[in-house]
Amino acid sequence: MADHQARQSGSSQRTVIPDPQLAKEKSNLTNYLRVFAYATRWDFCVYVVGALASIGVGVTMPLMNVVLGQLVGDFSDTVQDPYNMDLNNFKSMLQKQSLYIVGLFLGRWLLNSINKFCFRMIGIRLSSAIRHHYLRSLFAQSIHVIDSMPPGAAATAITATSNTLQIGVSERLGTFVTYVSTIIAAIAVAFTRSWSLTIVSASLLVYIAIIIAIVVPIYLKANAATLKADAQGTAVASEALQGIRLVNACGAHERIISKYSKWVTKAMERSQRVAPIIGAQTGLVFFGIFGVFGLAFWYGTQQFIHGVIKNVGVVIIVLTSVMLILFAFSYLEQPIMAISQAMVAATELFKVIDAPLPPMGSFTPDINSKDLIFKDVTFEYPSRPGARVLDGLSFRIQAGQNTALVGPSGSGKSTIVGLLERWYSLKHSPVLPEAATPRSSKEGERDNHDERKYERSTYEVPIMVPTNLTGALSGSISIGAHDLDDLEGKWWRAQIGLVQQEPFLFNSSIFENVANGLLGTVWENESEAKKRKMVQDACQEAYAHEFICRLPDAYDTRVGDGGAKLSGGQKQRIAIARSIVKRPQIMILDEATSAIDAKSEKIVQAALDRAIKTRTTITIAHRLSTIQKADHIVVLSKGRVVEEGTHKSLMEHENGVYYSLVEAQSLRLSTTDDTDSDLPATTYVAELKSAAVDIEQPLEVQNDEDNGPVVEPEVLRTLTQSFVKLLEGLRDQSSSFLLITIASMGVGAATPLQAWLFAKAVIVFISPSDDLKKEGDFWGFMWLALAGGVGVAYFFQCWISLRLQYHVGATTKQSYLRDMLYQELSFFDDDSRSSGTLIGRIAGDPKQVEGVFGLNLASATSSVFTIVGCLIISLTFGWKLGLVGLCVTVPIMMVSGFWKFRHELQFDQMNAAVFAESSQFASEAIGAMRTVSSLTMESAINNRYKQLLDGHVEAARRKAQWTAVIFGFAESATLGCQALILWYGGRLISSGEYSLEAFMVSYMAIINGVEYAGQILGVAPSAAQAAAAANRILDVQDSNRSSQEAEKSGPTVEDTDGGVEIELCNVSFKYPTRNVSIYKNLDLTIKKGQYAALVGPSGCGKTTIISLLERFYDLEPNHGEILWNGTNINDFGVYQYREHLSLVSQEPILFRGTIRDNILFGVADPSSVPEERIHEVCRDVFIHDVIVSLPDGYNTEVGAMSLSGGQKQRIAIARALIRNPKLLLLDEATSALDSESEKIVQAAFEKARKRRTMIAVAHRLATIQDADIIFVFDQGMVVEKGTHGELLQKRGIYWDMCQTQALDQ
């Protein structure tokens, strides 16, 4: 908590933080140690217990060396003087020492179990705490800071980065403590026996420390660079998955994959560049380890010759201690690497956690009946100094009145909303890092988002600069006598009810979504019954109650990811209910009815009119029919007020801006009778109530029990099946596998040879004194030769396996994203495959798989060769002892390792499932940051996230108890095996069957073989995680193959002039994940070159036709057909078919890159499009002048420029037209545009329609009144069709919709 409090500093004009260069130099180790500051007192107690247990585990093996040394000494005495041996005393001593080893085994089992349980639990607890603090710190930042973050970084931080940190503070840290204590204890034991020999042996420590000091900084730097490139790639994948419909419509799969591959390849190359350095480190370390054993052996013989060491047991204790240090150092490699990666991960996470917080006010005054006053407000976004959004803006919003803000796109309307919501400030405008979590594109703002160019690395030190360097900020916004910046932020937002153009709903029940509006109010802690009553009242006010009650679960119906299971109008009414349930004093309606059809608009507008009667209201609208009754209308242009007044007074100025805006939206109603247009009040209210029920198609959601999503079950595969299938895709790496195998054979041969050399070393000490020096020199040289060979083998093994590992990771990432992008759209409709979940999988799953195919694979391979070599040499020198090892000890280690692996697999599957849930929740919340902020949901989101994490910790605690016991046994069983081998081998020596050399060779070979047998399955943690990840990857791959197999290579779409004829013949359809029929036997014909419009209430099936024409979904057999110039569209190859049509959706989506990149997004070969063609299309949609006015013109990065919603939409339209489609689909394509822009773009459409067929879905009827034919839908059927004039003459549903939107009555 202390560092959170320390971060808030500075004045209203300047926020000061430490110099960024100093921040960059902060030690990774310091940040790693800071992680432990999140531990509670109880956590520290558990840590102490776990650390003591780890130390105890580490000490057991050096104590075992003491026993072994004493036994060898006794065996040596027996061999030298067999006639004076007391057999009973020898057997008694043998039994005593064997029981002592059994005691060590039991103690090590207990301590290992405690160690594993404690470190695993604390690791999960600390990881959960860091994840929680990361999210909390992110939500405490200003909105524009989160706007500037690239998509996907949140998922990376909360999944892959946090997982890396968790590994480095849990079991791997415990392993590090264990082996460090082993090294220290081994040195202590050796030192007490012979300090001089120990000092010689300890030279190894200095040697390894020098190597590590050289290599680790290089590795850390390379790893940080890799993380940055990975984050860039994740951002590309994130955008693609969030905009998957647009990617499919544009056929931009390969473009996205190419862009993603560029970053993935860069990350791979950076990693592979450091692979030989890590290989050299490993080779040099193992050369030193084996070499120092030869040095210690040679020096020991010298000491023995001169009488300094008199007992061969002393030499054995020291030598085995050196060997133990050898093993301990070799085992330290992975823990050190894990801790190093955790240091980097901690630094990345703390960059966000430590980011300075914006100043917050503290006043909570009475604002009832107080006016809102804008006085000389000048505002520029931090990323756009010099580009004024508001320029000396002054106006007053009267208390209790409805003030409407109108004007063209980019005039500053939504910036005013941002200032009122305190998302931006006139006193401080910090520029914060691109190091944190991005916002999702699910929830956009239409005007002037502060999206900064992503030039620097994704993870960078926070930077704040003085406001005078970030753009002009002046003026004031006040309510009563109080400046908005002086008010307490959350309290102020709780006084505002905000309804945005693009409503965002959370993937929870309707009740929970509406009840979110009560957060931060006096009703937040009311009983559920009271809340339900308030929610129901609010829904009735918003005319949503009736359609909700018709759902299977009513208010408990879940709305899907982002509210995907609701129509646009349904979502908007839920959002309106959410905003009015808290009875706010101020209402802000930011295009609140833009997504609603004409009839629904009349209903909702009536609800809004009723809701705002006694409230101060700010209404932003492009559809001017919604603000005719406003008490005051403010007309904006270029950040200034150009006109003010009522609708009536402004319409008196025929040359005025407002008058021209109204004229642009007017509907021709010449065939209507004016006397009939106004209904009596009682009739109007009755009509509203009737329409609220009748126009709504039942919500297309499924009852979770009865009508669950129809998704294909995941294929269950064994670990072997998963990895064999993945290996099939790595045939091009067969040479790497071969080289790894050869190098692993060299590594595997080291241990059997070491056992033989060790036995020879023991025999040397019982040789005649004349031969001792000569033998000592010879065998010391043999140790040196072995060290050289082992160093070379380890160098190549590590280098090649790391290169393979990084290659596997890169190729898996690319194929994984490719398989995801090429899925059918129904794949993404399943709740378990939300964009947040898939982004987390893209970031995490390939990482898990690459770990198994790299060093872990090489380690397992060399372990197999080691076991085989050890068994061969033990059977050669002593077959009886070898058989005991083969038939008893090795099976024990293998079985215990198998059970360890099995429980670890189950644990990691549970771990992945829970963290996937929490990751999905966090990603969804970050994507809806504006909604979260406006509803003051930050605390609720944090608490819910913490509940998810706490639940995971508790589930992990229960599971970890059993896995810890099994782990403890598996990692201690080697001591039990040693007790058995020593006891049996001693009996063989005492009976004279074995010589000391035969026993020592067999004993050392069996013990080392047993150790490596356990290590084969010692990769359980990595393999367990990788197995689950591999299954998910293969499930996606198999699903994509099914899609590809379904792809037909039928007829080619003919390149015809003048458009195409579209026929829907007897079409029946329901969505794959929903059990509700959309159409039953629908027939519809659109002639070649026609401009057809589809209109009707929300949920009637208009947009579904667009989805079917785009082949987002295909009709099932015998459910009708859709014909393209007489050919069933299902007969065409889907990707080739989509090249001939373009889609412009209601919500414009622009991807990272330049404006030119976005315009050419749907073009297969962008280089083939001349620059003049790009300019021509942009001129047609009247965006060219805006683009060339930007500093970099068409090369302007989209993220570096805050484009208004209208500007974004015009770029999206240019993107559609440059493909020269035969069929142009417009799904509310002009709904985000102001009247002036709409008129311009409509003219562009009129020009574009001459050469193609055009189908438009529209709620704003003025945009389609010139259509050649208009189809009026209701409940999945065409109930009227004709031209605008013909339908008005019928005075039916269409006529009624026109009356609602008419502006000239």
Curated annotation (Swiss-Prot):
Glycans are attached at N28, N468, N507, N525, N1040, N1066, N1075, N1125. Its main location: membrane. It is found in: Membrane. Residues 440-454 have a biased composition (Basic and acidic residues). GO terms for cellular component: mitochondrial inner membrane. It is a multi-pass membrane protein. The chain crosses the membrane at residues 44-64, 99-119, 172-192, 199-219, 277-297, 312-332, 737-757, 780-800, 851-873, 877-899, 964-984, 999-1019. Pfam families: ABC_membrane, ABC_tran. InterPro entries: AAA+_ATPase, ABC1_TM_dom, ABC1_TM_sf, ABC_transporter-like_ATP-bd, ABC_transporter-like_CS, P-loop_NTPase, Type_1_exporter. GO terms for biological process: oligopeptide export from mitochondrion. Residues 434-454, 1038-1057 are annotated as: Disordered. Signal peptide: none annotated. One of its GO terms (molecular function) is ATP binding. ATP binds at residues 407-414, 1096-1103. Keywords: ATP-binding, Glycoprotein, Membrane, Nucleotide-binding, Repeat, Transmembrane, Transmembrane helix, Transport. Residues 48-348, 738-1025 form the ABC transmembrane type-1 domain. It comes from the Eukaryota. Residues 372-663, 1062-1300 form the ABC transporter domain. The keyword Transport applies. ABC transporter; part of the gene cluster that mediates the biosynthesis of the lipopeptides W493 A and B. W493 A and B consist of six amino acid residues D-allo-thr, L-Ala, D-Ala, L-Gln, D-Tyr, and L-Val/L-Ile linked to a 3-hydroxy-4-methyltetradecanoic acid polyketide chain. May be involved in excretion or internal transport of W493 A and B. Belongs to the ABC transporter superfamily. ABCB family. Multidrug resistance exporter (TC 3.A.1.201) subfamily. This is ABC transporter FPSE_09185. It comes from Fusarium pseudograminearum (strain CS3096).
